[in-house]
């Protein structure tokens, strides 16, 4: 069995999180288990890993507008100190836009966003990272349960295999910003009724529960 650890063990003074889950999109295909994914991650952080509920910004469906997501990220980023850590979990639609220079930009799509207009209505991962880079936090981990490419920047390590043994334990001690995504551009997030979760979050929760 793979083992994932989020225990503080004197590594961090405090823990902060932004957790977002969107099912009921206004202009995109609706999802079934993104909100359930978000709630399960939130509950596990609180009940097993001693995250304080007041240190978690939790946005689902109609709460997860573009402005509210940006405010939550800014609030957490400016609240965390240099001995703290930040976890950002997003479950919902992602989109990739190809740029004129051949690069790609990954976006998360808020409740009222449009996948065919990601630049105008979505939130670019670059912007999320810029906001969080203003933070003094020792460690930031982005768990993105969405499929898109164009996520990685020079100062961010990408990890794409949540089933990899001990992957969260391995990165927890590093002073770094890291991203784990459900898949690359053009792939689909897998949800199944038998799981009541996406494949990404199912594997994540199983690892955290060990």
Question: Where are the regions a protein language model picked out?
Answer:
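Caspase-like (clan CD) cysteine peptidase catalytic core
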Residues: 4, 14, 66-91, 95-157, ...
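Short, conserved active-site loop motifs that form the nucleotide-linked donor/cofactor pocket
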Residues: 15, 56, 177
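Active-site-proximal C-terminal subdomain of hydrolase catalytic domains
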Residues: 21, 45, 60, 137-210
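Glycine- and acidic-residue-enriched helix-capping/strand-helix junction motifs
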Residues: 25-39, 43, 191-195
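Short beta->alpha junction loops
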Residues: 56-66
